Curated annotation (Swiss-Prot):
GO cellular component, one term: chromatin
GO MF terms, alphabetically ordered: transcription corepressor activity
Protein name: Protein UXT homolog
Source organism: Dictyostelium discoideum
BP GO terms, sorted: negative regulation of transcription by RNA polymerase II
PANTHER family: MEDIATOR OF RNA POLYMERASE II TRANSCRIPTION SUBUNIT 10, PROTEIN UXT
Assigned protein family: Belongs to the UXT family.
Length: 161
């Protein structure tokens, strides 16, 4: 009789241990799912947005560069253009002197350059922006790798019995 109740207590002890392990595992699963959703995915989306802005910036500089190269090639000392007044509302304009150009170098600061200086500046800016995109892509891939690793870990945690 005595030995029977002893094994019964032993079984309860095992059940309590099992219960405890299960609870810890569920807590871990919840913790890592929250970490993925509230931290990693947020970082990932922000990093992707940041990279998009840099790519857009790069595109604008490259467009400007090709326009400047056209001015130089065609030896245009004056030109007609359309100026965007905002909200896609344009007005015709005539540029009397194309030997100088004002380039937005960031933070709303415009610098007066000769066309050749502007090309030189844009080439440097292009190198910098390409490097930035490269770094942001690395960061995005690192975050994606972290998410994958944790998701694989979660899969294993969920399949443990």
């Amino acid at each position: 009789m005595v030995s029977h109740s002893h094994s019964h207590t032993h079984q309860n002890q095992k059940d309590i241990e099992k219960e405890k392990l299960l609870k810890e595992r569920l807590d871990s699963i919840k913790y890592y799912e929250t970490f993925i959703n509230e931290t990693l995915n947020v970082d990932l989306n922000k990093s992707i947005e940041d990279r998009e802005k840099v790519l857009e910036n790069l595109e604008n500089y490259l467009e400007l560069k090709s326009n400047i190269e056209l001015l130089i090639e065609n030896k245009m000392d004056s030109m007609k253009t359309m100026i965007n007044l905002g909200s896609e509302c344009y007005v015709k304009a005539r540029v009397q002197d194309t030997s100088y150009i004002y380039v937005d170098i960031g933070l709303g600061i415009h610098v007066k350059y000769t066309l050749e200086e502007a090309i030189k500046f844009i080439n440097e800016k292009e190198t910098f922006l390409n490097k930035t995109v490269e770094n942001q892509t690395k960061k995005i891939n690192q975050i994606k790798t972290k998410i994958d690793l944790i998701q694989n870990g979660l899969k294993e945690l969920k399949h443990l019995e």
